[in-house]
Amino acid sequence: MEQALERALKRSETEGKWRQRYHFTPPVSWMNDPNGLVYYKGLYHLFYQYNPKSCKWDSMHWGHAVSEDMIHWKDMPVALKPDQEYDCHPEGGCFSGSAVEKDGVLFLFYTATTQIDGVVHQTQCIATSKDGMTFEKYPNNPVIKEPPQGFSNDFRDPKVFKHNGKWYMVVGGCIGSATFDGDGRICLYESDDLYNWKYKGNVLESNGKLGTMMECPDMFELNGKWVVTCSPMNHPDYNKSLYCVGTMDFENCIYTIEKMGNMDVGFDYYAPQSFTDKEGNRVLIAWQNGWLWMPWCIEWGPTSLENWSGCLSVPRKVQLDREYNLCMSPVKDVDYLISQHVTYTD
């Protein structure tokens, strides 16, 4: 398979009419959500949902690329593949997650998907690395074996962060069916050591207004406020990624919303994930899930004929203005890619 991938990559790069030059694309085959964005040992690491065998979503792996500037990326070997009993469901695999560093070790958190007696189960798991290139799955996976009581098995996309000496994890979940009549939730967990987690409550609840499932949640602090983002399934708004700004009581798991809005006015900005760059800025990258990637629109889009499908947004620096609007601008190195300027006026 490795030789076949190399041949496909050469064809895709040399003959690709649609191959992106401005946005990150997979070397070959299908990609979607960005995962595990982190600056570690002098390099930016970009992981992403990846199916190395097809231009269609299936059997999720974690693709991997590294960069010195978040613009020019070098493809690396696949970081995670579904090879354990708890993550080997053929229509699942190693779903989305995040990365943190602790004592020089890189921790990857991901959702493992398997099937038991015909029922799909989603659990939260760990893989670690001391060099950022080779990863070992934790022998006692999964570290969170089931969703909170009353939740469905749609329980995925852990985002881990540190606050006041403790580790926290937000995970997307729902009451009912994520596909049809569910009510989305963002769950909060707490840990002292990254291995043992305690459920604290829900940061955000849909209550019939914010979709049936809150995929790819994120939570980070900006200017003394806490920003919560997610990509709700079946949300009535056409724009697919939302943000909230407010205050957070971690001890009692009470999030008070002061502002809410769309993260992007387009329809192709899904599963955004944030991380801190080497200068301390908060940066976001998202999957550009334009409709041409989807099977019901021109099969899988013209890029599938070139052996690849999917791309990511350029990295965006995130800030809050005085009215707590979430403001984004391309990171500074993007300017080097612009060779011609065009100005539009109202």
Task: Describe the function of each predicted region.
Residues 274, 280-283, 305-307:
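Structured ligand/cofactor/substrate-binding pocket environments in proteins
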Residues 1-157, 161-209, 221-266, 286-345:
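Beta-rich carbohydrate-recognition and catalytic domains
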Residues 159, 272-273:
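A generic local secondary-structure boundary/capping motif
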Residues 269-271, 279-281, 315:
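Active-site lining segments that contact anionic ligands and/or coordinate catalytic metals
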